[in-house]
């Protein structure tokens, strides 16, 4: 197959500045290439990156992109400009185009032969009705499937595919639980919708018994955070705790080292309409962290309460008490931590890049064969 991965306007590939979607497709593209497919990955230009290069069997093409603006309206305009350039750089022999860009599925109307595979990486906001050219809406969780169904007629549900996100790394080392440290970790954007103030209230309620809090992620608005003032106020909220804000860490080996040392991973997101999958908890589980997550639907695809993690009710009148009780349970019981962590490690198999890549390839082949058969039938009628 000739596969094109078309990313958005604001993050470079390789994902030096982060971006969960860019990170995922960068790894998946390499797996597709290992399986013998020709892969072209289109992304924004970035200083130090050539306009074209080959990385691990994947042909990378880069077009002029943009820095994320604060204005959502301006963001959509810049994405449109970028997407038009990016679509024009797609090779003519392409069999399938995978894209998470807002405008690309619309501009791909001009390409009548390639399958258009829309990766609905964020909760849709009304745009799906404009994607008449899309052969598939790929959801990464049951929560996203439900959101897609809210935007398209029931007669179009057959276009929905559910394929989970894979782990963005391979060849993980064995976990030695004896050398893990008393660290409660959060990785993600330092944003008000992520429930970090709730986490602060929760840990202030209990005796942490020497456990440390580590928060990894950007707070700058340009990188999806809530800003410097928010971060400074958040530091004050953790008044009774030993807390460290590291800022963003994009180096995979350094991030994995942090995961490997941590014992508990807390992701108390309050984003009812924002979270689609929860890659950070999945990554943490693969390194033997016990996840504690809020009761959002997206997490339930891979976290089962008291089986491989803990889920607390963030919608109750006392969510801080609920979260505090979950943290305290794990601090108090080493056996509970280890039992849950051993089960959490199974995501290394269920969500490996190799396994998920093969799921995608099977899906791609079905869609490509279906489109070819449909085009052949249309051409047959034209000749009559």
Which stretches of residues belong to each language-model region?
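N-terminal strand-loop element at the rim of the active site
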Residues: 9-13, 31-73, 221, 295
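Conserved donor-binding/catalytic core segment of Leloir-type glycosyltransferases
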Residues: 138, 171, 176-194, 200-205, ...
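Nucleotide-activated donor-binding/catalytic signature segment of Leloir-type glycosyltransferases, i.e.
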Residues: 227-253
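Acidic donor-binding loop of glycosyltransferase active sites
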Residues: 260-276, 289
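Short hydrophobic beta-strand element within catalytic cores of glycosyltransferases
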Residues: 286, 290-293
């Amino acid at each position: 197959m000739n596969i094109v991965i078309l990313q958005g306007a604001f993050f470079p590939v390789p994902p030096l500045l982060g971006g969960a979607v860019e990170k995922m497709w960068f790894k998946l593209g390499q797996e597709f290439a290992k399986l013998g497919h020709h892969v072209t990955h289109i992304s924004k230009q970035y200083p130090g990156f050539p306009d074209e290069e080959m990385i691990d069997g994947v042909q990378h093409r880069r077009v002029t992109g943009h820095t994320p603006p604060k204005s959502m309206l301006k963001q959509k305009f810049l994405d449109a400009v970028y997407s038009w350039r990016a679509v024009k750089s797609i090779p003519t022999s392409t069999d399938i185009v995978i894209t998470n860009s807002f405008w690309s599925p619309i501009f791909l109307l001009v390409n009548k032969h390639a399958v258009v595979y829309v990766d609905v990486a964020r909760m849709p906001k009304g745009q799906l009705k404009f994607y008449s050219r899309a052969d598939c809406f790929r959801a990464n969780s049951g929560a996203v499937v439900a959101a897609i169904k809210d935007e398209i007629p029931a007669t179009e549900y057959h276009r929905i595919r559910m394929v989970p996100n894979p782990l963005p790394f391979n060849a993980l080392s064995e976990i030695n639980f004896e050398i893990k440290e008393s660290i409660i970790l959060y990785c993600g954007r330092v944003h008000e919708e992520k429930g970090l103030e709730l986490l602060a209230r929760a840990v202030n309620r209990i005796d942490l018994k020497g456990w440390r809090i580590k928060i990894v992620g950007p707070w700058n608005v340009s990188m999806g955070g809530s800003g410097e003032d928010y971060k400074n106020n958040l530091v004050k909220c953790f008044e009774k705790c030993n807390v460290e804000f590291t800022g963003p860490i994009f180096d995979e080996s350094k991030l994995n080292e942090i995961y490997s040392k941590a014992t508990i991973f807390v992701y108390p997101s309050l984003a009812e309409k924002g979270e689609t999958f929860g890659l950070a908890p999945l990554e943490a589980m693969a390194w033997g962290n016990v996840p504690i997550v809020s009761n959002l639907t997206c997490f339930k695809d891979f976290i089962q309460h008291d089986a491989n993690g803990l889920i607390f009710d963030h919608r109750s009148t006392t969510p801080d008490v609920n979260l505090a009780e979950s943290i305290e349970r794990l601090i108090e019981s080493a056996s509970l931590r280890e039992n849950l962590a051993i089960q959490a490690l199974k995501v290394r198999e269920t969500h490996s890049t190799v396994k998920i890549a093969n799921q995608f390839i099977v899906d791609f082949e079905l869609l490509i064969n279906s489109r070819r058969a449909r085009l052949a039938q249309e051409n047959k009628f034209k000749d009559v």
